[in-house]
Every structure is written in structure tokens, then in C-alpha cells.
Regions:
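Gram-negative (and chloroplast) outer-membrane scaffold detector with strong preference
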Residues: 57-131, 190-191
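Predominantly the C-terminal beta-signal and adjacent terminal strand-loop region
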Residues: 75-78, 147-191
């Protein structure tokens, strides 16, 4: 009897110690992600220079758990002027490469560093250059280009859905409004 109990305990131990983990970050896998967040600081009321962004991207995984990313983003920011706020909007396309540099043993959490090229269009005050007080807005609508450096954390909720948290610094050298924008966002990725 003791022999049977010992064999069953050994079998149960083998079942729990050699668990198979989900297949994640394999070459050729594809994912679609949606993110939203705040830019240039955290402002919770409408009376400040509140800024937000939303974006969508498509990822293709390569060797060593790295990935190519292509996507688009919309950034909206308000600038104070006298007793009004002037909206600035940026529409950008992104193409970049993300390098995974840290993950846990169970492949639940992944930390990646990404470098992207950005290009798009920037508009000030919805292209209205004459302000209500008679002033003329000198900032012109223009094409913008630059890059972004991103630190991204992926936490897998299921085998096909991951929660994203990222921080990124965008540098847009041809912008009339601001060259640098810091963004913090949350999102979901569907594999």
C-alpha cells in the first residue's frame, strides 16, 4: 500500500513540476494593439493644458522575441491663451522595432524597449488662424517628422490578450508647437 501511495505522489509531483507554458513571442506571431493615455503630464481638469492620445498598431514578432511595429496615433493638446484654449492636433504614422530585454520564467510579463520613426501632420486651432480677440495665430499647419523611444510592459491576461503599459518620449523636429512630448498610456493587445 505504501508503495502505491509513493508512486501516486511521485506522479503528482511530476505533473506539477513540468508544466507547459503558453507559446508567446514566437517568430511569425502577429498582434493588434490599442492604446490611450495622457501626454505632457497628468492633468485631470479641462481648465489646464490637458493632452491625450489614442493609437492603434500592428506587431509582427521576429527571432529572439523582438518585434516590428507599424501603427498610427492621434494626439490632442490644448494651449492656454488669455481666457481661451487653443487646440493642437497631431496625426502620426509610426514604424519601429521593439527589443525584448526582460521577461519572467513563465512568460507572463515582458519588458521591451522600442525605437520608432514618426511622420504625420500637425494642425493648430483646426486651421483657423484668426482668433476671436482679433489676434492672428502664427503657427502654421505643417508636416511633421521625428522619432520615439518607448518602454513597454506587456502582462498577459490570457494566451491571446495582453495588458500594455508604456511610457514614451516623442521628438518631432519640424513641429511649430513643441518638439518633445512625453506620453504615458495603457492598452490591450490581441494576439
Amino acid at each position: 500500500m505504501k508503495k502505491h501511495i509513493f508512486i501516486m505522489m511521485l506522479f503528482a509531483l511530476c505533473l506539477t513540476s513540468f508544466q507547459a507554458h503558453a507559446q508567446r513571442y514566437l517568430p511569425g506571431m502577429k498582434g493588434l494593439q490599442v492604446t490611450a493615455g495622457m501626454a505632457d503630464g497628468v492633468h485631470w481638469n479641462d481648465n489646464t493644458d490637458f493632452a491625450y492620445h489614442i493609437g492603434a498598431a500592428y506587431s509582427v514578432y521576429t527571432k529572439n522575441a523582438n518585434r516590428w511595429v507599424i501603427g498610427g496615433e492621434y494626439l490632442h493638446k490644448k494651449y492656454d491663451y488669455k481666457d481661451m484654449q487653443i487646440p493642437v492636433e497631431q496625426f502620426t504614422a509610426e514604424g519601429g522595432y521593439y527589443l525584448k530585454f526582460l521577461s519572467d520564467r513563465r512568460k507572463t510579463f515582458f519588458l521591451s524597449l522600442g525605437l520608432s520613426a514618426l511622420a504625420g501632420y500637425e494642425t493648430s486651432n483646426q486651421s483657423e488662424k484668426l482668433l476671436p480677440d482679433g489676434s492672428t495665430l502664427l503657427d502654421k499647419d505643417c508636416f511633421i517628422y521625428g522619432g520615439a523611444l518607448t518602454l513597454e510592459l506587456e502582462a498577459y491576461l490570457t494566451d491571446r490578450i495582453a495588458l500594455l503599459a508604456n511610457a514614451r518620449e516623442r521628438a518631432l523636429f519640424s513641429s511649430d508647437i513643441g518638439k518633445f512630448h512625453t506620453q504615458v498610456s495603457l492598452g490591450l493587445k490581441f494576439i
